[in-house]
């Protein structure tokens, strides 16, 4: 029995089949241990825990309860084959019934022990499987936890780096703000110091002015007191010779003072005369400038006239080119009617060239229209607000004529009319400046007469009145001079603006003439290329023309239509 139990503990296989010989040779101690299932369980797992012992005791109790009610004479049926083979030869019936009962009891105990071992083995296997599964789950959980720990550590490091960068940025911002605050505080302190310094300087200046005023008032009071005292002295000494002598001395002193004052007034009068001479020189210089401006305006008019002549020459050359193009077109239409029809590719190329020429013509018309609009704007700007009422009818008629025609077509002769009107306006402005110059010359003559009158009357009037009048005249002359300079400056600015506008108009006209010449050159090249292509085709296809003579009627129509398109294009130009 003990060997069987040791075999169960040592191996994980099924329990060996017990035999009757082994059961008979068991010692008494082993037999006593096998008789109780609890003792067998304790023998198998001597170091088991309390829960395992309780579970084994419950299972043995259940097995014992299931085997006790059975007939003691019957053999156990759990493993009939193994028990029948292991029992060996049955004892003779003549043996002692007690021995038989002991043997049967031992067999039952063996069966119970076998079942218990099998159950324990299965339970051990289940527990090993559960242990492996739990170990696997624990390993997976540990790996998952390690991954989460690694991920959390990495995120923590990233966040820590971000927060460190953010903290460094915030620290730099705080440092910059602190520096800015310090600079602002420094500026504020400097401004306060400057303000206090300015207030102190102003207060000191005010105090100095007050002191000067007080000193002047004191001097005036002293002088008045002296005058009063002198008058009292004169009254007191009027009856005596000494008083007459003192009076004579005082009169001599007054005469000396008046002579000094007279010299001063003469000096001031000479300065006033010099200023008058300077004003006269300024007026003469302004007259010279007006003459120069008139001469420049005349030069601009000559340039405008020359530009108009050049424009007429360009138009005449354009008309000659149109006539030449019409002749070439007619000649080409006649040649195309007699020759073979052009190919589809040449027709496409010619149509594309015609479209390009049409686009260039449209661009030229747009540029002419822009130049015409700009000249009209200059005319309206030169008219000014004073002549707005008189120009309403002209503008309305021009607007109606421009509205009836296309927005891109310049009316016939309208550009020349606008240029003539611009010239007329410039001439009217120059003529309007002549009365201003005349008025200035009249004022200068009046100033000269007044100067002569001042020279004549300077000897008769008192010096003080002469000085005051001279000062007033000088102020009036300065005011008039300033007004004249302001008017001349305005006229100069108007003349400069007119010159700049006229130069812009002339430049635009030159650009248009250059574009027209370039367009004429392009037209010459296109016509020459078309003629060369026609001659080359006539030379390269003499035989094909004879073979395709029957299709000449059909081929004439597109060439004639193309010639009509080209002729209409030059007719529009």
From Swiss-Prot:
Subcellular location: Cytoplasm, Cytoskeleton; Cytoplasm, Cytoskeleton, Microtubule organizing center, Centrosome
Basic and acidic residues bias (residue ranges): 68-77
Main location: cytoplasm
UniProt motif (CC1 box) ranges: 113-117
Segments of this protein annotated with the region Disordered: 67-97, 386-412
InterPro entries: Spindly/BICDR_Dynein_Adapter
Coiled-coil annotated spans: 118-376, 440-525
Biased composition (Low complexity): 387-396
Summary of subunit composition and partner proteins: Part of a tripartite complex with dynein and dynactin, acts an adapter linking the dynein motor complex and dynactin. Interacts with KIF1C. Interacts with RAB6A and RAB6B; interaction is specific to Rab6.
UniProt-recorded name of the protein: BICD family-like cargo adapter 1
């Amino acid at each position: 029995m003990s060997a069987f139990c040791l075999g169960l503990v040592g191996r994980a296989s099924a329990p060996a089949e017990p035999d009757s010989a082994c059961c008979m040779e068991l010692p008494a101690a082993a037999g006593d241990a096998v008789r109780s299932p609890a003792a067998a369980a304790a023998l198998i797992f001597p170091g088991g825990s309390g829960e395992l012992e309780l579970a084994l005791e419950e299972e043995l109790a259940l097995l014992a309860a299931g085997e006790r009610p059975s007939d003691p004479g019957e053999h156990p049926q759990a493993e009939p084959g193994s028990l029948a083979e292991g029992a060996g030869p049955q004892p003779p019936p003549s043996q002692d019934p007690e021995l038989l009962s002991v043997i049967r009891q031992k067999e039952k105990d063996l069966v119970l022990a076998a079942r218990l071992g099998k159950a324990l083995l299965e339970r051990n296997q289940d527990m090993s499987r559960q242990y492996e599964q739990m170990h696997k789950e624990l390993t997976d959980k540990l790996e998952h936890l390690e991954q989460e720990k690694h991920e959390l550590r990495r995120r923590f490091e990233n966040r820590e780096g971000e927060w460190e960068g953010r903290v460094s940025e915030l620290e730099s911002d705080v440092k910059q703000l602190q520096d800015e605050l310090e600079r602002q505080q420094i500026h504020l302190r400097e401004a306060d110091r400057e303000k206090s310094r300015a207030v102190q300087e102003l207060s000191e200046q005010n105090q100095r002015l007050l002191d000067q005023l007080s000193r002047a008032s004191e001097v005036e009071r002293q002088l008045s007191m002296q005058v009063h005292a002198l008058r009292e002295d004169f009254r007191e000494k009027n009856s005596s010779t000494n008083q007459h002598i003192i009076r004579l001395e005082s009169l001599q002193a007054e005469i000396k003072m008046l002579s000094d004052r007279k010299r001063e007034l003469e000096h001031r009068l000479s300065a006033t005369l010099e200023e008058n001479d300077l004003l006269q020189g300024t007026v003469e210089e302004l007259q010279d400038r007006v003459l120069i401006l008139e001469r420049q305006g005349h030069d601009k008019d000559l340039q405008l006239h020359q530009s108009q002549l050049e424009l007429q020459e360009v138009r005449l050359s354009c008309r000659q080119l149109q006539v030449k193009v019409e002749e070439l077109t007619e000649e080409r239409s006649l040649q195309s009617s007699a020759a073979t029809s052009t190919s589809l590719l040449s027709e496409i190329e010619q149509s594309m060239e015609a479209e390009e020429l049409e686009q260039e013509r449209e661009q030229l018309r747009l540029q002419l229209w822009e130049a015409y609009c700009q000249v009209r704007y200059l005319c309206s700007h030169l008219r000014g607000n004073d002549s707005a009422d008189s120009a309403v009818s002209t503008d309305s008629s021009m607007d109606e004529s421009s509205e009836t025609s296309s927005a891109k077509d310049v009316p016939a002769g309208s550009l020349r009319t606008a240029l003539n009107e611009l010239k007329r306006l410039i001439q009217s402005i120059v003529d309007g400046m002549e009365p201003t110059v005349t008025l200035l010359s009249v004022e200068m003559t009046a100033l000269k007469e007044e100067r002569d009158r001042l020279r004549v009357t300077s000897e008769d009037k008192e010096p003080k009145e002469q000085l005051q009048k001279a000062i007033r005249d000088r102020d009036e002359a300065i005011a008039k001079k300033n007004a004249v300079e302001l008017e001349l400056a305005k006229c100069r600015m108007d003349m400069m603006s007119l010159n700049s506008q006229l130069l812009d108009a002339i430049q635009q006209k030159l650009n248009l003439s250059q574009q027209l010449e370039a367009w004429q050159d392009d037209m010459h090249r296109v016509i020459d290329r078309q003629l060369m292509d026609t001659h080359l085709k006539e030379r390269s296809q003499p035989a094909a023309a004879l073979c395709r003579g029957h299709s000449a009627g059909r081929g004439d129509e597109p060439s004639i239509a193309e010639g009509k398109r080209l002729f209409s294009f030059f007719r529009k130009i």
